[in-house]
Regions:
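Positively charged n-region of N-terminal signal peptides that target proteins for export
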Residues: 1-4
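Bacterial N-terminal signal peptides
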Residues: 7-16
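Active-site nucleophile/metal-coordination loop of metallo-enzymes that catalyze phosphate/sulfate
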Residues: 22-31, 44-133, 149
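A long, amphipathic alpha-helix that forms part
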Residues: 27, 168-179, 196-237, 397
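Metal-dependent active-site segment of extracytoplasmic phospho-/sulfohydrolases and closely related
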Residues: 36, 54, 216-259
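His/Asp/Glu-rich, glycine-adjacent segments
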Residues: 87-205
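Acidic/histidine-rich catalytic neighborhood
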Residues: 236, 243-286
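Active-site neighborhoods of enzymes that stabilize oxyanions during catalysis
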Residues: 272-384, 388-396
Length: 420
């Protein structure tokens, strides 16, 4: 009996010790700090449509934009890197999710891990490189570009992207960085969550999948807020919560098959390089074939076909050598594909077609609008501001961190609109 009692006391001591070790200490000597959080595919209207108590609290107490305008094309990699650098995709090198680069005759895609980590693709200067160059430490977690050495610099902390890495563990990793000694602690941290984007793609923006995904990411935000409060720094850390783009409802039967608009027997003769992105396509014709291909594709419905030099200025798109000489843009709700890539639509139990979601369309469309919410000592409180372009966020972060910004495309008026 005595042995059982002593064992019990020892167990209580171990549990108490573990709890004590797990209880964070207040963080002291905190420098101006930014945590940039990306909720991929989160439409601003979701805040009113679906329950998200933590995000709603941050938006109510802090500052939010009516919406943030993504850069064209409204795809994941181009827009994350536009936010990070303040440069439009036309200037930052990441002109799409799938890219053909004539300068080294190579292709890039999100799934080509070796290329994702190769700095030759990533132009400009992301905020974490700006911080490292000026003596601050950075920790971009799963943010596009963070795996590469850019301008001779790497972040102090980074991790190879793993979409299966649990959301709560991402939060805990960020909090652990804040627990580091002052000399080791990063001032620029990023987090990335793909749940809402996956839900939107799988079932469309008006779906139970999206509702559940928002609940999950909001729980993660709650864990972050509670972790900051436990360290007595919730009101001392600047949180910036953004999305890269919105989401449009798509009928999977709405496909423009490019093969139908040129002579397949001439395919080898034409020999074009194509960078496929579903909602838009870059075509690099062989010399002398541009007019033929352009004339053929102009016959296709539900797309707009531009010569590179004729892309409207409002897109800020058309000077990079990684943009095709011909660019085909899909109408909202349509996709572009080749015959060998088209798959039959998924059917629901009642036999009807399952609608899905897509993005990458005209960045001025309401369905493509992105989220911006910020909370912290640098930001205005209980404010709603007019829409602005996502390339403006870089200057906002640089101002908070007291960094000299690299050359960028952002409008500094947004800094004044958001900050105290």
């Amino acid at each position: 009996m005595k042995r059982i009692f002593l064992t019990f006391i020892a167990l209580v001591f171990v549990v108490h010790s573990a709890f004590a070790q797990a209880t964070p200490k207040p963080v002291k000597d905190l420098k101006p700090t930014v945590i940039l959080i990306s909720l991929d595919g989160f439409k601003p209207e979701y805040l009113e449509k679906y329950p998200a108590p933590t995000l709603s609290m941050l938006a109510k107490e802090g500052v939010r934009a009516k919406w943030m305008t993504p850069s064209y094309p409204s795809l994941t990699f181009p827009n994350h890197y536009a936010i990070a650098t303040g440069l439009y995709p036309d200037h930052n090198g990441i002109v799409a999710n799938n890219i053909y680069a004539p300068e080294f005759n190579e292709t890039f895609s999100m799934s080509k891990r070796e290329e994702v980590g190769n700095g030759r693709w990533w132009l400009g200067e992301p905020i974490w490189v700006t911080a490292e160059k000026q003596g601050q430490r950075s920790a971009p977690l799963f943010f596009p570009g963070s795996e590469a050495e850019i301008a001779g610099k790497r972040p102090s902390f980074w991790k190879v992207f793993n979409d299966d890495f649990p959301n709560f563990e991402r939060i805990d990793m960020a909090l652990s960085w804040l627990d580091l000694p002052k000399t080791e602690r990063p001032t620029m941290i990023t987090l990335y969550f793909s749940d809402v984007d996956h839900g939107g793609h799988d079932a469309g923006p008006d779906s139970e999948d999206v509702k559940q995904a928002i609940a999950r990411v909001d729980q993660s935000l709650r864990r972050l807020v509670e972790g900051l409060k436990a360290r007595a720094i919730f009101d001392r850390v600047n949180l910036i919560i953004v999305s890269d783009h919105g989401m449009a409802r798509v009928d999977p039967r709405n496909v423009v098959v490019l093969d139908d608009y040129y002579d397949a027997n001439q395919a080898q003769q034409i020999g074009w390089n194509i960078a496929w992105n579903s909602s838009m396509v870059h075509i690099f014709p062989k010399p002398g074939m541009e007019d033929t291909i352009y004339a053929s594709l102009k016959k296709a419905p539900h797309v707009t076909v531009y010569r590179k030099k004729e892309i409207p200025a409002r897109f800020h798109y058309g000077t990079s050598n990684r943009i095709g000489e011909i660019v085909v843009m899909a109408e909202e709700g349509w996709s572009i594909n080749s015959r060998d890539r088209v798959r039959p639509p998924q059917l629901l139990p009642d036999g009807s077609v399952k609608y899905r979601g897509a993005h990458g369309f005209d960045n001025q469309l309401e369905s493509m609008r992105a989220l911006f919410v910020a909370h912290g000592p640098a930001f205005k409180r209980a404010a709603v501001v007019e829409p602005f372009a996502n390339v403006d966020v870089y200057n906002v972060m640089a101002k908070i961190l007291k960094l000299k910004p690299a050359p960028n495309d952002g409008n500094k008026a947004t800094v004044k609109a958001l900050l105290r």
